[in-house]
Structures are given as structure tokens and as C-alpha cells.
Amino acid sequence: MSGTLLAFDFGTKSIGVAVGQRITGTARPLPAIKAQDGTPDWNLIERLLKEWQPDEIIVGLPLNMDGTEQPLTARARKFANRIHGRFGVEVKLHDERLSTVEARSGLFEQGGYRALNKGKVDSASAVIILESYFEQGY
């Protein structure tokens, strides 16, 4: 086991990506993947899996603030199931509430409005999802 994990922040137009190490509990952003109505370039995801060889994949689970599901929740679950089905890698869902808000805030502090491009926000959200996963002891 390498201790490497990949995280995805699922979206219908852009999917944020981060890679992290379990041993350090840290993550860093990778370029976001463009999606068409939630369908990613599966060849690109396959290349990411071959390059990073993750032990597991974490997919952010979008929930309402009260913990109930929203329309995007089912689509994120489907995305996670497809990754598992196509590539046979272990996939876990992780609560992503407020990750985008936190990502926008952090990027804005670093570079103002210019730093808030969609791909950067999505991948920064994936970093937050993965670091939250590590912080919870997984």
C-alpha cells in the first residue's frame, strides 16, 4: 500500500481533483477535469489512476446543511459507483458540506477575484474534502 489517495469534488461541469498522502495527512490540488452534464473524460481518470496508483478514492458527497440529500447527491454517488465499477478501486464517499465555501475563501485570500476560477475552486475543494477525511482519522 502506497498510502496515496485521490479525491474528487464532483460537479456537472467541472470535477475537482486532489492527491494526498495518508502518512502526512496532506493533500494538494491537481488540474480539474472538465465534465459534460456530469460525465467526465474517463480516459483522463484512468490516466490519473495509473499515474498515482491510489489505495482508495474519496468522492465528496454533497449534502444540505441539515444533512439531507440534494439533487447532486445521487449524481455524486453514481460517479463514485462508476469509478469503482470501471477500475475496481475502493471508493468512499465523504461529506463535503462547506468545502466550496472554504475553498473560495482561501483562494480569494491568496489572489483576490482573479484566483477564483472554477477549476481552481473545484480542486481546492477536493483538497479540503481529502484533508477533512484524514482529520477524521481515516
Swiss-Prot record:
One of its GO terms (biological process) is rRNA 5'-end processing. Keywords: Cytoplasm, Hydrolase, Nuclease, Ribosome biogenesis. Its EC number is 3.1.-.-. It comes from the Bacteria. One of its GO terms (cellular component) is cytosol. GO terms for molecular function: nuclease activity. Belongs to the YqgF nuclease family. Could be a nuclease involved in processing of the 5'-end of pre-16S rRNA. This is Putative pre-16S rRNA nuclease.
